């Protein structure tokens, strides 16, 4: 690691166990992970390896059974849920396999929403600008049901980057798309990531996609493996 860089995300001894009938199911075991500012990291593994659970814990969306996560220098699990949500709103963007757009809002309004919640007075102009960056300048007034899957994911990307987050979590962002649409979305993820200088943590089962990241972290049976 370059000495001038700092860890924007640090996990130590992360474990996750859940009840399964009368027994316990171990999902994650003793995960240690550091991510430096500006880095692009892929977390890869087969279905059931624990990668999506790890991402949820790293983002403070789920709580670990053991261990500690620091995001931008803050101990996530020393905060209550409201404080964690406020930290995410300030510093984190998300892109999921399901687009999670609000069906009653237009593309423009979906992207404006986090900007308005953060108090940005230029929300409409900012949202329009980033939708143009993702190739949707002619779709601003369209509702999600009138957009293709690839277009909906582009709106979700624009929304995620609209607040210029320090860290973007992407969980199987092309999982609901055909190959052509998925390739276009992934190109945009990396283009926007470079343009905004955002740190990227990408969860995927796609090895070719993972290799586009600077570093690959592999999970198997809830552990990081070589």
Regions found by a protein language model. Give the residues of each.
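Basic, Gly/Ser/Thr-rich N-terminal segments that form RNA-phosphate-binding interfaces in CRISPR RAMP
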Residues: 226
């Amino acid at each position: 690691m370059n000495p001038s860089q700092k860890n924007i995300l640090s996990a130590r001894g992360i474990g996750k166990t859940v009840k399964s009938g009368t027994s316990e199911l171990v999902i994650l075991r003793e995960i240690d992970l550091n991510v430096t500012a500006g880095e692009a990291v892929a977390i890869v593994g087969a279905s059931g390896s624990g990668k999506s659970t790890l991402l949820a814990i790293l983002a403070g969306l789920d709580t670990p059974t053991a261990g500690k996560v620091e995001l931008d220098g803050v101990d996530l699990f020393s905060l209550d849920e409201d404080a964690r949500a406020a930290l995410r709103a300030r510093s984190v963007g998300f892109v999921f396999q399901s687009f999670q757009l609000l069906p009653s809002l237009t593309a423009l309004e979906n992207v404006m929403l986090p900007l308005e919640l953060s108090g940005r007075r230029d929300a409409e102009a900012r949202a329009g600008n980033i939708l143009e960056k993702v190739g949707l300048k002619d779709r601003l007034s369209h509702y999600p049901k009138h957009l293709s899957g690839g277009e909906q994911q582009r709106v979700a990307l624009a929304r995620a980057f609209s607040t210029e987050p320090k860290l973007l979590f992407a969980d199987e962002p092309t999982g609901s798309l055909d190959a052509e649409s998925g390739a276009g979305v992934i190109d945009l993820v990396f283009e926007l990531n470079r343009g905004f200088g955002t740190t990227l943590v990408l969860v995927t089962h796609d090895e070719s996609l993972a290799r586009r990241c600077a570093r690959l972290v592999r999970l198997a049976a809830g552990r990081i493996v070589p």
